[in-house]
Amino acid sequence: MTMVGSRTSPIFNALRVELNAREAELVEIPLIQPADPFLDMAGEDLRRRIFLTENENGDSLCLRPEFTIPVCRNHIALNAATPKRYAYLGEVFRQRRDGAAEFLQAGIEDLGAADEAASDARSLADALSCVKAIAPDAPLEIVLGDQSVFAGMLKALGLPQGWRKKLLRSFGDAHSMDLALAELTGTQRRDPLPESLAVLVAEGDEIGLARMLEAEMLEAGISPGAGRTPVEIARRLIEKEDLAATHFPAAALDLLRQFLAIRVSLDTAAVTLRAFAADNALDLGAVLQKFEARADAIAQAGIEMKDIIYDASFGRPLDYYTGLVYEIRDASNRQDGVLAGGGRYDRLLTMLGACEAIPGVGFSIWLDRLQALAGEKQ
């Protein structure tokens, strides 16, 4: 019996052929990775699932939980020229309630391409081709979102910068978004802080607040280095106090909720968004031009736009995603979970230490889910 976790799996070999045909350098990434980049930049869900350890010097290490961050770090370390396309195929390790903790992923990271619309379309087309190569008869659902359109909507509504950042961090997480909107309307109750902390928060004294928090953590036997640092906690408390002082008109929040409820096929999405903006006197011109350029590029790549769902609320609550996000799923619901997911992350390489901005877009495929959908004989 050949399992998909094996590098001798037929699916593994078939995907290697697919990746080799796509003008991308197949790279080998070490299984053991420094943990800090994942802990600092990955979402809360992934942070909870990482297998952590330490080396003899006390440095935090982890088993590779995904490929995008280490592929980008490797590109920076090599000081490689762009544009550059990398492919990968190998094991990742995550604590999961269901399924094995070790499984295979494959994907492509496209770094430094000048034509954003074309590289976005190519990423989606490559992901779709790889999935169809393994499961040619499977009914697929493609869902597409756009972080930049949501950001443009927040700007057009006149939201303060602090609230824009908070809502962007919640984009794609329905529960977190509901809590943020309730907070913005002033309907969410907040637990009061102890008076000694509340005074420092009200004064915006980040240094004094961090010192007090560190002292309280040490007194309680909690290491200040475990989890968020006292400085990070202090900064977040002061930010929350500033945000709580801002309340937004109910009509504007209703418009935001109407926007998030938009879910249409991609071939009608641009018209729908332009009509929504015109009807409500919102300036979304620049972001919608980019949205339309990408839709045109997707059509030119041979993908039927009527088969793609644009969901205005679909995103990823990660700081480095900047535009396109997408997922390919099993439309028959026989297989739970995402088969392939991708998106544009133009901030990631700078956050990882690149000396200049390097745009990026990429995707990952879950081989175990794809095998289950394809019904490969074992």
From Swiss-Prot:
This is ATP phosphoribosyltransferase regulatory subunit. Pathway: Amino-acid biosynthesis; L-histidine biosynthesis; L-histidine from 5-phospho-alpha-D-ribose 1-diphosphate: step 1/9. NCBIfam families: PRK12295.1-1, PRK12295.1-4. It is found in: Cytoplasm. It holds the Pfam family tRNA-synt_His. It comes from the Bacteria. GO terms for biological process: histidyl-tRNA aminoacylation; L-histidine biosynthetic process. This function is generally fulfilled by the C-terminal part of HisG, which is missing in some bacteria such as this one. GO terms for cellular component: cytoplasm. The keyword Amino-acid biosynthesis applies. GO terms for molecular function: histidine-tRNA ligase activity. Required for the first step of histidine biosynthesis. May allow the feedback regulation of ATP phosphoribosyltransferase activity by histidine. Heteromultimer composed of HisG and HisZ subunits. Keywords: Amino-acid biosynthesis, Cytoplasm, Histidine biosynthesis. Belongs to the class-II aminoacyl-tRNA synthetase family. HisZ subfamily.
